[in-house]
Design a protein with these regions (language model features):
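Solvent-exposed beta-strand/loop surfaces of large extracellular or lumenal domains
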Residues: 5-19, 271-272, 536-555, 658-682
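Aromatic- and carboxylate-enriched substrate-binding clefts and catalytic-loop regions
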Residues: 8-10, 64, 198-453, 488-490, ...
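Catalytic and substrate-binding clefts that recognize carbohydrates or anionic sugar/phosphate headgroups
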Residues: 12-166, 176-177, 182, 189-194, ...
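Conserved, mostly hydrophobic/aromatic
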Residues: 35, 102, 192, 238, ...
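An acidic-aromatic substrate-binding cleft motif
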Residues: 151-179, 199, 718-728, 732
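Catalytic core of carbohydrate-active enzymes
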Residues: 335, 340, 355-363, 377, ...
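Accessory, solvent-exposed terminal regions and/or long lumenal/extracellular loops of proteins
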Residues: 560-665, 672-674, 678-689, 693-789
Length: 790
């Protein structure tokens, strides 16, 4: 007999029924939908290759399947952890990683065999139960062709949605395995403020509890008062700084007699305290788990602990329920407890437990080796995880530990490139093992390294409104923010070949830098899909789609490509993501007409499924006229701001002749080093439409040819040149060229003249350097520094 009880994978059994037809013949029954046709021979018993056939419907990607058919093109899912891995190779087992199969395949179909999986019972807090009929068949067959996005959304229909994390999860997390004290943590936070570096989450590793014999160990549940003499006041200090905190847990050793909460737990479990016996960790024991939450963890949550970091150290399988994965089950238990007992959104950070764990959000990928190989592998690993909806991997940015035999030096270039990539991952969190050389605090770096590292965090916060909108898409449709290229370009061979390249949401393409620089530049081969042009954000270059191209980047540049014409809502400078009323900078990228629907909600309540708001922003271009519209906000949620400050930022923009806002003439600022027009809309009610009309002249020089990068590289090279020759006096041409971007800001009315002069001077750079009378070595160095090409 078939069971309709929810399983670990399929939590929804009562599903919407698609349109279908049935042909009921004497020997067979045929069920047809728009995507497939199922044919079964009656009276033949369990499904086998002899009695069941599923074929694609007309017009669909062709396939024929019978039980036992092996997929040839599975696009893979993820793995439990990166512990001990350098790239895809484990330095301890000397085995290469074999990613689990995912939900998607180039074959166009997937079978999920759920027959052996555990079920949930129907108790008030649903609990694990084994299947009564061990030989039953519980299958889900998905036919999707190459419509991968449809497959993922369909999976959420029966397997559940990916919960929307609280907004603060998309800020910067500071984490380090280090025996921090209360005072050191305060100094750390002060330094973040001093250097104007945003911060949302502080992670405290296992030294929050006692770790020495007789007091603690890997497992611990009692605050170490040598380091934190007053935990409540420490947590209160963090709250006063709008910070969230998570504590590390290694739960495997249960509750020892030396723990503060041991007497309460012993009484709860009926253990004789006189025997001083350890209370074992058994996650399947509902009474034990209720005691752990109510007696041990809940008091700390009430003090101010926001969520828990479930680190590895529990046994692979439960001690009482045979074959029950401790990782899978502990993730469910902790997350569902937060669902049941908190007013705020549940969030957990943990290792992957298997299919169905997408319902418990944030992943902790573990202890990866510090190396370029590890950085090179992580984009592919992260992208593939979206194929099982595990779209929120949190990596130890910069790597966790050195490999035995490696020189223990923190390579600033490797860390910088990892941080730049980390800013464009689901969760931005630095971490490392307890090693005195792994000082990843940004203020330990100098010059371009500090600039690039700090800018990576600032860029992350700029992107927060876009990222949060994409997180809502993950909840609605099952599409992760970091997704392989084949989701959008399933018929392009390059979408499968360029494994590290990915879409970061709907509008942004990222081609990570995963190798060291040569002669001060990183060269990356980038595939730009056809269908639209692409704006290389960091250099201000508009590139044609439908090509594979090599591009070079300095340390402070990174290959991020925005679909031409995109409209992206961004933040300016923010302290963190605690506030819900920050001004929005609506960025308009060069290209054709574009639009974006900005999403907002309370940020941390549990009512986001129905309580939220959206604002549509769009552009219309006609010859030399640009219209930008910020539509009226639709929807509502708790504590929603009634009005908001908007600014319009037009990238690659010339100087306008006129600007109006809702028919009234308006002023503007010009940002010379970005070639960007900035228009401030007076703060108005969010439910009012705002229309900005921008009229340009008919004579506009080419602006999206990389001149922004030329400005920046030239200025940096001039600054560095002064340290090579402190007595240098710049010629008028060299001085004017270096000052172009600031001159544009000061004197935008000279726009055409300044741009034309810069381009002329830049094209004549060898002659300018001769006029400057630089020696041969400095001339060659300068040309390389600016990346000059004829």
């Amino acid at each position: 007999s078939f069971t309709d009880d929810p399983s670990f994978v399929a939590i929804h059994r009562n599903l919407p029924v698609p349109k279908y037809t049935v042909q009921n013949k004497n020997a067979t029954v045929v069920i047809s939908t728009a995507r497939m046709k199922l044919k079964y021979k009656k009276g033949q018993g369990p499904f086998t290759k002899d009695n069941l056939t599923i074929t694609s419907a007309k017009g669909m990607f062709p396939f024929q399947w019978t039980p036992g058919t092996i997929q040839k093109g599975n696009l893979k899912g993820t793995d439990r952890t990166l512990d001990g891995f350098e790239g895809d190779h484990n330095i301890y087992s000397h085995q290469d990683m074999k990613l689990e199969d995912g939900l998607l395949s180039t074959d166009g179909w997937t079978l999920i065999d759920d027959s052996k999986n555990f079920l949930f019972d129907n108790s008030e807090w649903a609990w694990v139960k084994a299947r009564e009929h061990k030989d039953g068949q519980d299958w889900y067959f998905m036919a999707y062709g190459h419509d991968y996005k449809a497959a993922l959304k369909d999976f959420t229909v029966f397997a559940g949605k990916v919960p929307l994390p609280p907004r603060y999860a998309f800020g910067y997390w500071w984490s380090r395995y280090w025996s921090y004290s209360d005072k050191e943590m305060r100094q750390l936070v002060d330094n973040f403020h001093t250097y104007n570096i945003p911060l949302d989450v502080l992670v405290v590793d296992m030294d929050w509890h006692y770790t020495d014999p007789g007091f603690g160990g890997w497992t611990g549940w009692t605050w170490n008062r040598r380091l934190f003499p007053n935990p409540a006041k420490f947590l209160g200090y963090l709250k006063s700084n709008d910070l969230k905190i998570t504590l590390n847990l290694h739960p495997a050793d249960g509750v020892a007699p030396y723990e503060e909460k041991y007497p309460e737990m012993a009484q709860w479990m009926g253990v004789d305290t006189a025997k001083q016996e350890r209370i074992p960790w058994v996650v399947s024991d509902k009474r034990f788990i209720n005691g752990m939450f109510n007696k041990v963890l809940r008091p700390m949550e009430k003090q101010g602990v926001d969520f828990w970091w479930l680190d590895w150290q529990q046994w692979m399988y439960d001690k009482k329920v045979d074959s029950l994965s401790n990782t899978w089950w502990i993730n469910y238990v902790f997350f569902s407890d937060m669902e049941r007992n908190r007013d705020t959104r549940p969030m957990l950070y943990h290792r992957w437990g298997g299919l169905g764990n997408h319902r418990y959000q944030i992943g902790f990928s573990g202890d990866a080796v510090i190396s370029w190989k590890s950085l090179e592998f992580q984009p592919y690993f992260t992208n593939c995880a979206s194929n099982v909806l595990y779209g929120y991997w949190s990596h130890d940015i910069g790597g966790h530990m050195f490999k035995g035999g490696d020189k223990e030096i923190l390579d600033p270039e490797l860390f910088t490139r990892w941080m730049q990539y980390g800013a464009l991952t689901p969760v931005m969190r630095t971490h490392s093992t307890k090693n005195s050389v792994l000082n990843k605090e940004l203020w330990n770096f100098k010059g371009d390294y500090f600039e690039a590292l700090r800018n990576s965090i600032l860029f992350r916060y700029q992107l927060a409104p876009y990222i949060y909108t994409m997180a809502r898409e993950t909840y609605d449709n099952g599409i992760s923010i970091c997704r392989p290229m084949y989701y959008d370009y399933p018929e392009a061979k390059e979408a499968y070949d360029f494994k590290s390249e990915y879409m970061f949401g709907d509008q942004i393409l990222v081609a990570p830098i995963t190798t060291p620089m040569q002669n001060g530049l990183s060269t990356v081969k980038v595939w730009l899909p056809e269908g639209n042009d692409w704006f290389e954000w960091t250099t201000g270059t508009l590139l044609k789609g439908g090509q594979i191209i090599e591009r070079s980047f300095t340390l402070t540049e990174y290959p991020v490509y925005v679909k031409a014409g995109s409209v992206l809502p961004l933040y300016n400078r923010v302290k963190n993501l605690n506030s819900n009323s920050e001004e929005i900078i609506v960025n308009i990228f060069p290209g054709e007409n574009g639009s974006f629907t900005f999403y907002e909600d309370n940020g941390n309540d549990k009512y986001y499924a129905n309580e939220y708001a959206r604002t549509r922003m769009y552009t219309e271009r006609k010859e030399n006229h640009l219209t930008v519209t910020v539509g009226p906000r639709q929807g509502k949620y708790r504590n929603m701001p009634t009005d908001r400050q908007f600014k319009i930022k037009v990238l690659g923009s010339a100087i306008p002749e006129t600007i109006t806002i809702n028919g009234n003439r308006a002023e503007y600022e010009y940002i010379g080093d970005e070639l960007a027009l900035l228009i401030t809309i007076p703060q108005t009610a969010c439910d009012q439409e705002k229309t900005i009309e921008i009229q340009y002249s008919t004579s506009i020089p080419e602006l999206n040819d990389g001149i922004v990068s030329q400005f920046k590289r030239f200025s940096k090279a001039i600054t560095a040149l002064k340290y090579r020759d402190a007595g240098i006096v710049l010629t008028p041409a060299m001085g004017a060229t270096e000052a172009t971007s600031i001159a544009l800001t000061y004197s935008p009315e000279r726009f055409n003249e300044l741009i034309e002069t810069f381009k002329r001077n830049y094209s004549q750079m060898p002659e300018m350097l001769k006029e400057q009378k630089l020696n041969e070595a400095n001339s060659q160095w300068f040309m390389k520094a600016i990346g000059w090409k004829k």
